[in-house]
Amino acid sequence: MQNVPDRHVMRWLDQQPVSDIWLPSVVIFELRYGLGIMPAGSRRERLEQGLNHLLNELVPGRIATLDGRAAQQAAQLAAKRKAQGTPVDLRDTLIAGIALASGALLATRNHRHFMDAGVAVVNPFNN
């Protein structure tokens, strides 16, 4: 997590309707885990406050969960990738499944793990 938000990402976010911005539940896991393994201190506390603000004030109720449809999409994608000899991190496969099930545009810097997933992807760091 960055101390200062990337200006390209902030500009891209400002151009999106607020109601269109959702977070996959898997991303919340990744963020909470990352904070959980950080050493205690002011940086961790500041980042935890920022994440709580994001979840409670900026995207309240807009969490895209790994439901049955998303799990099915992710499982099919994981099986396809394994058969092709190109497995990808499970968390990214679950995120792809959530995006596929909801027909969402996925904003990520990590295009590589989503190129073959059939998910529409945008890299807001390049805007």
Please give the residue ranges for each predicted region:
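Short amphipathic alpha-helical segments and helix-helix/interface helices
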Residues: 10-14, 96, 111
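Short, well-structured N-terminal submotif of metal-dependent ribonuclease cores
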Residues: 1-27, 36-53, 116, 127
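Short acidic-hydrophobic, aromatic-tinged amphipathic segments that line or gate anion-handling sites
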Residues: 64-65, 122-124
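Short, C-terminally biased terminal segments at protein or domain edges
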Residues: 112, 123-127
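Active-site neighborhoods of divalent-metal-dependent phosphate/nucleic-acid chemistry enzymes
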Residues: 20, 33-39, 57-105, 109
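Alpha-helix/helix-capping structural signal
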Residues: 26-29, 69, 112
